[in-house]
Amino acid sequence: MKKSFGRRLLKKISKLIPLCLIIASNAALSQEGQKLYPAPLLALDNFFSHHILIAEKSTHLLHLYRNNDGHPELVKSYQVVTGKKSGDKGTEGDFKTPEGIYNFTNFLTNKQLIEKSGSQGVIYGAGAFVTDYPNPVDQRMGKTGSGIWLHSTNDEARLDKGLDSKGCVVTANNDLLDVSKYIELNKTPIVIVQDLVYLNDRTHEAQKNEIKKNIEGWLAAWKNKDIESYMSHYSPAEFKDIKGNFVHYKAYKKAVFSNPGTPKIDLDNMSILQSKNYAIVTFMQRYQSSTINDAGKKILYLRQDDSYNWKIISEVFTKNGLEGSDKIAFEPSMRFFKDSTFKENSESKKGNN
């Protein structure tokens, strides 16, 4: 009996150690007068990145950050499990969790999961946030698979295993309910990394400004209808969109630029995130010309070429994620579980997603 109690106590203490180390590390940095920022979070804003999640596979932690005047501030961390196999996801069914930057596009309630998967739906716990894996960068790299979610579980003993999912990020039911308060679909990104790297203030600012300067040059060329300068910001080898490849897109933009008048283009609410081999710039775009008057969310996916110059490989324009643009500030709430009758059943069978 005493041994059993001791094991349970040790297990509880071990869960607290990673978070204690984070708090201690942050305190030490504050005392030394240094500023360190998570490398993936270069620039935040109050609309598209008021809160951001970083899942760190090596520590089995999900970190919640909030925007603090353009810089990330750690709010709290949650214990998670990821794919049964280590490494970056590459193919369908490899049991690996992808590494990159993703948006939540949908939320499935416990009831919907059971309707969708039958009795197996209970293994997803309270609910599931669906990501947009594979994103355009994943597709360029030939990655396959789908159904990468942030969800909870009906068997929280799994959380002690660290590597125990088919590729999803899995957390406790209460933690999913808590973190859901800070999530907005198509607005709250999740960055998945193997190891979370931190940058000092100077390096963080330099990397942010490098990408920001690139976007400013792209915008200036667009406003001036300078087709060669504009297309120099795109990757001839990798760029694709609904108009086709680089050559097709250039022909399309050349025709657009030939229209009379000068377009009025404004970018607001810009956020800049980076992964190990690409960056994502998200902003509100307003475009007005003699023939078009439109506004929406634009996402630019960029990769560095052989000369380390950032080039656009994909751009996505959508109306999704504009909801609430008239609000002054984001307010955390139980929006996804407002009408939920979900109650954790401690006697439920073990799941293994």
Predicted regions and their residues:
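Short beta-strand edge/turn micro-motifs at domain boundaries
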Residues: 295-353
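Short, solvent-exposed secondary-structure junction/capping segments
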Residues: 231-244
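Exported/periplasmic cell-wall-interacting domains
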Residues: 95, 110-216
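Surface-exposed, charged secondary-structure patches
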Residues: 96-97, 122, 251-299
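Short, solvent-exposed aromatic-acidic interface loops
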Residues: 79-86, 150-155, 286-287, 314-326
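Short, aromatic-enriched amphipathic alpha-helices that serve as compact interaction elements
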Residues: 207-226, 233
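Gly/Pro-biased beta-strand-loop elements
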Residues: 36-149, 328
